[in-house]
């Protein structure tokens, strides 16, 4: 296995670059515990068949399931595909040191299974986060005269357009 920053990833033992590669991925980071916890969030606790603790739902269960799948097939010599397992960081904050960082280090990925709680429904896509760094340009002028261009008003028009834009549905 390889540790890159706070990410851990591995290829199956008999990786063959001529075969298609399946990525098994889930994230290992969690949100901070909230003040309403009634149990120690840093200690896994089982009660009535349920596991309590930080990461036990999102996405600890998926992470260990994908790891178990990877380990089951890791030593197989004649797999018709390759497997790559990646336990990635910074999913909760959409950071640049998670999957965005790992993609440049992983082999070419043809297909991915991403473990995330979906109430046992198969999800073929998921909403993401888009961060935009924008600049709005105006023209300075005296406030008493209407000779300038207010950059804030220009930005509002752009924000309104973007907030009502509907991305085309593709699958």
Residue ranges and their predicted role:
Residues 17, 29-31, 120, 141-142:
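Short, acidic Gly/Pro/Ser/Thr-rich loop/turn segments
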Residues 19-84:
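Active-site metal-coordination/substrate-binding segment of hydrolases
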Residues 27, 126, 142-144:
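Histidine-centered active-site/metal-ligand motif
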Residues 59-131:
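Acidic/histidine-rich catalytic neighborhood of metal-dependent amide-processing enzymes
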Residues 144-171:
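Acidic-enriched catalytic cores of C-N bond-cleaving enzymes acting on peptides and small amides
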């Amino acid at each position: 296995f390889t540790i890159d920053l706070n990410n851990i990833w591995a290829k199956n033992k008999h990786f063959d670059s001529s075969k298609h590669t399946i990525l098994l991925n889930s994230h290992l980071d969690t949100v901070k515990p909230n003040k309403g916890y009634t149990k120690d969030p840093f200690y896994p606790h089982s009660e009535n068949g349920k596991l309590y603790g930080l990461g036990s739902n999102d996405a600890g269960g998926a992470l260990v399931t994908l790891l178990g799948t990877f380990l089951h097939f890791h030593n197989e010599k004649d797999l018709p595909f390759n497997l790559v397992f990646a336990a990635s960081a910074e999913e909760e904050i959409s950071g640049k040191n998670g999957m965005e960082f790992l993609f440049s280090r992983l082999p070419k990925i043809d297909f991915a299974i991403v473990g995330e709680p979906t109430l046992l429904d198969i999800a073929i896509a998921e909403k993401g986060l888009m961060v935009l760094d924008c600049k709005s340009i105006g023209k300075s002028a005296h406030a008493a005269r209407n000779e300038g261009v207010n950059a804030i008003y220009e930005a509002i028009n752009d924000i309104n357009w973007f907030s009502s834009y509907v991305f085309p549905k593709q699958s």
